Amino acid sequence: MKEIKLKGGLNVPLFGSVEKFIVEDLEPKFIGILSEDYFGLKPKFLVSEGDQVRVGQPILEDKTNQGFKIVSPVSGVISSVNRGEKRALISVEIENDKKNSLFELNISGDIGEDLNNAGLWDSFRERPFDRVPNINSKPNYIFVNSCRKDPLELNPNLII
């Protein structure tokens, strides 16, 4: 086996740029919630296959991070729950009914709890392993990345 050592990184020559347009009214027929987006997730299902869900309704709760909820991004019917080896969760598919009926939230006044109930807690990432933080943890610092510099990244001025 040949060993390759790189010093100073690798410069990949990428040419071109991202097209500057926004697709309006893109509503797919099926939405998937993938377990690979949540490292270490031990899911507890709050709904089952065939259940009707609304936007913001909790679908899964993490057993290891008590209280962390994953909510439905669309309204519709849970069409399938896909499992792999040892019944590990692979994905949850939701058939979009395109009605976008909302799940009613109770605002408690606690910012962390309200973010979790709204399904926004998974937007936070804990360093250095890029995991969803524990619900009860209090951060020492918060880093806000307002502009990514990855190759072929979308221009933030177009979005704003």
Residue spans of the language-model regions?
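Generic structural motif
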Residues: D37-L41, V53-G56, N65-S80
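Buried, small/hydrophobic-residue-enriched core segments of structured protein domains
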Residues: N82-I160
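Short, solvent-exposed cationic patches
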Residues: E24-E27, V77-N82
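Glycine-/proline-rich flexible loop or hinge segments
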Residues: V55-K63, K98-S101
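Acidic, glycine-anchored pre-beta loop/turn
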Residues: V47-V53, N82-E85
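N-terminal, Lys/Arg-enriched amphipathic/low-complexity engagement segments
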Residues: M1-L46, E61
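Short, Lys/Arg- and Gly-enriched loop/turn segments at beta-strand edges
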Residues: D62-P73, R87-I90, L102
